[in-house]
């Protein structure tokens, strides 16, 4: 297990890089670009480690070759130089982007095997380059288990190519679908090694890019859709506004009706109270008429005759009033009938003269009546004075 800096980028020229690590580091070859036929060589990296160094240099021993078993080396402390590795990191590590080169004949050199077969030892992977055209590479970052940091071996990067791409092949002791831990004894102690099969990188096709014309068509299409949606929204907003105005007007009408209903209820309560008061008065009047009716039965016969006479007088008075009304109607009808007659008719003139004489006579009669009354009053006064004069000597 290696603890190193978060980002390790393979140099395009295959130069050596240095990192600080605790544990076992395995080598990963780095492809160096070349203009013609070239042989890819692994890039070396000097590491400072507390563990078993690589077999190339350092103090201590280990499994220098997979084909032969050696005695287990002692635990060493020193500087060891190894090939470029893809260590197990704690953090997000950017993957190197090696560029493929066009070569007629190219041979690959495999990296050195791991220096010490520990719990986290991984077999080295060798890259066999083939004839390919160079293309931009896409780097895949590792997503780890602890909050987005990578806790494990970094994934290999896939080189995008239009024709042929270089596919790295994993060299492992066991080629299987799933990694299987193996227990191997060598020397004085047993080493528990876990061999994993690296995932083959597949060619990733470049994403199709939109041209300016296609982008303009999409923008125009979206603009038309947006305008249609805007029209629909405007229509719906106008309709909702009309509904809102209608609701407001209906709300005002409902409030007015509510006020009118409250007023009617108040008037109804007042009317009920007045009706109750009238009913109470009527009941009191009935209670008062009860004793009077009892007393009326005990009245003598004279009172009964007087009451009958009073009823007859009332009847006569009603008849006289009816007769006077009839006379007025007859006079009005005669006047209406006389309006249409000719005023030059001598009969009409004679009638007018007679009416004037009649009115004069009536006035004379009323005046004579008044004079006679005054004379009578004067005579009465004179008589009284005479009596007073004759009574004086006595």
Curated annotation (Swiss-Prot):
GO-annotated cellular components: centrosome; chromatin; cytoplasm; nuclear envelope; nuclear pore central transport channel; spindle pole
Species of the source: Drosophila melanogaster (Fruit fly)
Function, as annotated: Essential component of the nuclear pore complex. The N-terminal is probably involved in nucleocytoplasmic transport. The C-terminal is involved in protein-protein interaction probably via coiled-coil formation, promotes its association with centrosomes and may function in anchorage of Nup62 to the pore complex. Binds to transcriptionally active genes. Negatively regulates chromatin attachment to the nuclear envelope, probably by preventing chromatin tethering by Nup154.
UniProt comment concerning the protein's domains: Contains FG repeats. FG repeats are interaction sites for karyopherins (importins, exportins) and form probably an affinity gradient, guiding the transport proteins unidirectionally with their cargo through the NPC. FG repeat regions are highly flexible and lack ordered secondary structure. The overall conservation of FG repeats regarding exact sequence, spacing, and repeat unit length is limited.
One GO term (biological process): RNA export from nucleus
Free-text disruption phenotype from the record: RNAi-mediated knockdown in oocytes results in increased nuclear size. RNAi-mediated knockdown in oocytes and nurse cells results in irregular distribution of chromatin to the nuclear periphery disrupting karyosome morphology. Simultaneous RNAi-mediated knockdown of nucleoporin Nup154 restores normal karyosome formation.
Sorted UniProt keywords: Chromosome, Coiled coil, Cytoplasm, Cytoskeleton, mRNA transport, Nuclear pore complex, Nucleus, Protein transport, Repeat, Translocation, Transport
Region annotation 5 X 2 AA repeats of F-G: where it falls in the sequence: 22-117
Region of interest (Disordered), ranges: 45-73
Identification of the protein by name: Nuclear pore glycoprotein p62
Positions annotated as Sequence repeat: 22-23, 50-51, 75-76, 77-78, 116-117
PANTHER family, alphabetized: NUCLEAR PORE GLYCOPROTEIN P62, NUCLEAR PORE GLYCOPROTEIN P62-RELATED
A single GO molecular function term of this UniProt record: structural constituent of nuclear pore
Compositionally biased spans, kind Low complexity: 45-57
Homology family: Belongs to the nucleoporin NSP1/NUP62 family.
InterPro entries linked to this entry: NSP1/NUP62, Nucleoporin_NSP1_C
Coiled-coil segments on the chain, per record: 211-341
Chief location: nucleus
Subcellular locations according to the entry: Nucleus; Chromosome; Nucleus envelope; Nucleus, Nuclear pore complex
Pfam families in alphabetical order: Nsp1_C
Tissue specificity of this protein: Expressed in adult male accessory glands (at protein level).
Source species taxonomy: Eukaryota, Metazoa, Ecdysozoa, Arthropoda, Hexapoda
Gene3D superfamilies hit by this protein: 1.20.5.170
